[in-house]
Regions:
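The catalytic Nudix box helix
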Residues: 269-303
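N-terminal strand-loop-strand
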Residues: 220-268, 297
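A residue-level signal for conserved active-site and pocket-lining positions in enzyme catalytic cores
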Residues: 23, 47, 191, 209, ...
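Catalytic cores of DNA base-excision repair glycosylases
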Residues: 4-9, 18, 22-207, 211-220, ...
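Acidic, metal-coordinating catalytic segment for phosphate/diphosphate chemistry
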Residues: 208-242, 308, 315, 347-363
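NUDIX/MutT-family hydrolases
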Residues: 318-364
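Short, low-complexity, intrinsically disordered N-terminal peptides in bacterial proteins
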Residues: 1-14, 361-369
């Protein structure tokens, strides 16, 4: 049966039945699986683009409590949306979600119910369009995320690089063939669940797999975990970053990053990357001058945080600093504010800055001289 999974209708029917029976018996009880509301399903799928299921529950609950309908999300400010998204990372998702909500609200508040209509929304790619259209609207579109790619590569023993366009097209075609018509939502979620919980990257639990008898990698390879082929990892550059907790009396200076680009729209303790030949203190003074056009005195380092992004990592050194002169300007930021430390919770910060805030507890306003 292994050799003919995609060639025999009976094998495909068995595969569907076995997979769906396993899913219905073992699926996790997740908030976004308890609804058919397209808006809530859309929110969950945008979050799942770069966030593991086991990390998402609290974030999903917080976000939909803040914005229970697409009209609520559309009416919010970008700052409110970013604050509700705070901690999830990949903030372009939140900005695109906000833009898309405004488009949907302007057209009456009904999310598009087709793959093509969903694909036209900001921040919606082929995976999200397939997931939402199948789960919310019963459209027969297979999903192809990392979990499903891994499952299909092993089932079919595809040894070519799944990032290649031709291989990706073959995987989508296989998904279309295997898909249970009329049950695409459950089928897609079953495939993703199988990849997340059983057909895992490093140590697949083949003995627990409901469709193991169809798997060519299990039948023909000594180690199914060899598939899919993994690209060699490129070394990630590491940067030293200095940030300033700049006091003016009892107030702290915070700056908002430009809306486009990394961490767009988030607030931060201003600073930047250390350049060759300068100390961290010199780096901070230079960055503040270039970004805000003010002069500061840099004092001691208060906290040090390690943080990783997709393509690089940083060590963030947070320094106490004192404002000396100049009127802040938006030379390298979107906005700036002097705030009482008690007000920091009103602003959306990156995870690295949140770690600084948490580590410092925060500073007592009386200890800033």
């Amino acid at each position: 049966m292994v050799a003919g999974l995609l060639d025999e209708a009976a094998a495909i029917a068995d595969f569907r039945r076995e997979l769906l029976a396993w899913y219905r018996a073992h699926r996790r009880q997740l908030a976004w699986r308890q609804t058919r509301d397209p808006y809530l399903i859309w929110i969950s799928e945008i979050m799942l683009q770069q966030t593991r299921v086991d990390q998402m529950d609290a974030y999903f609950a917080r976000f939909v409590q803040a914005f229970p309908t697409v009209h609520d999300l559309a009416a919010a400010s970008e700052d409110q949306v970013l604050k509700a998204w705070e901690g999830l990372g990949y903030y372009a998702r939140a900005r695109n979600l906000h833009r898309a909500a405004r488009e949907v609200a302007a057209r009456g508040g009904q999310l598009p119910d087709t793959y093509e209509g969903l694909l036209a929304l900001p921040g919606v790619g082929p995976y999200t369009a397939a997931a939402v259209s199948s789960i919310a609207f019963d459209r027969d579109h297979p999903v192809l995320d990392g979990n499903v790619t891994r499952v299909l590569c092993r089932l079919l023993r595809l040894e070519a690089d799944p990032r290649q366009a031709a291989v990706k097209a073959a995987l989508i075609a296989a998904g279309e063939q295997l898909l249970e018509p009329g049950q695409a939502g459950d089928f897609n979620q079953a495939m993703m669940e199988l990849g997340a919980r059983v057909c895992t990257p490093a140590r697949p639990r083949c003995g627990e797999c409901p469709v193991a008898r169809h798997c060519r990698a299990l039948a023909e390879l000594d180690d199914p975990a060899r598939l899919p082929r993994k690209a060699p990892r490129k070394p990630r550059p590491h940067y030293q970053v200095a940030a300033g907790l700049i006091w003016k009396g009892d107030l702290l200076l915070i700056a908002q990053r430009p809306s486009e680009g990394l961490l767009g729209g988030l607030w931060e303790f201003p600073g930047g990357k250390q350049e060759a030949g300068e100390t961290l203190e010199q780096c901070l003074a230079r960055e503040i001058r270039e970004e805000l056009a003010i002069e500061i005195a840099v004092d001691e380092c208060l906290a040090q945080v390690e943080h990783g992004f997709t393509h690089f990592s940083i060590t963030l050194h947070a320094f106490r600093a004192r404002y000396l002169s100049g009127e802040p300007q938006t030379l390298g930021c979107a906005a700036w504010r002097w705030v009482d430390p008690s007000e920091l919770g009103q602003y959306a910060f990156s995870r690295a800055d949140l770690q600084v805030i948490e580590e410092l507890g925060f500073l007592s306003t009386g200890d800033n001289s």
